[in-house]
């Protein structure tokens, strides 16, 4: 079984794709990109539009990479779990990010801190 996880933080967006086989977890891909989602959130209480766009663009690339891995591994799809932390939790407009990622087929969970 293959799994993918996306972690959207205040500064970075990370991807981890693993294969679980016979009880052993094998890392296939690990990516990290600087997205600076949290710029200005502490002062304004909102996510900036350009920061949301950077995250959406990054997650879109990650989804394409996950689809390519699924094809290589000859599986129809790989489930993607996505979480967001502090900046999304603190922003009044985090729902906009959640909605934009949902359009990509990624359901984002904003986790408590």
Regions found by a protein language model. Give the residues of each.
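Nucleotide/phosphate-binding catalytic cleft detector across ATP-hydrolyzing
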Residues: 1-8, 16-113
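Primarily the dimerization/phosphotransfer
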Residues: 11
């Amino acid at each position: 079984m293959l799994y993918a996880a996306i972690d959207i933080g205040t500064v970075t967006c990370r991807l981890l794709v693993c294969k679980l086989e016979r009880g052993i977890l094998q890392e296939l891909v690990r990516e990290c990109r600087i997205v600076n989602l949290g710029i200005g959130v502490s002062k304004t209480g909102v996510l900036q539009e350009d920061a949301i766009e950077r995250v959406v663009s990054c997650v879109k690339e990650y989804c394409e990479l996950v689809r390519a891995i699924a094809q290589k591994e000859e599986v129809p799809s790989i489930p993607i779990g996505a979480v967001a932390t502090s900046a999304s939790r603190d922003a009044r407009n985090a729902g906009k990010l959640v909605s934009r990622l949902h359009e990509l087929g990624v359901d984002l969970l904003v986790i408590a801190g």
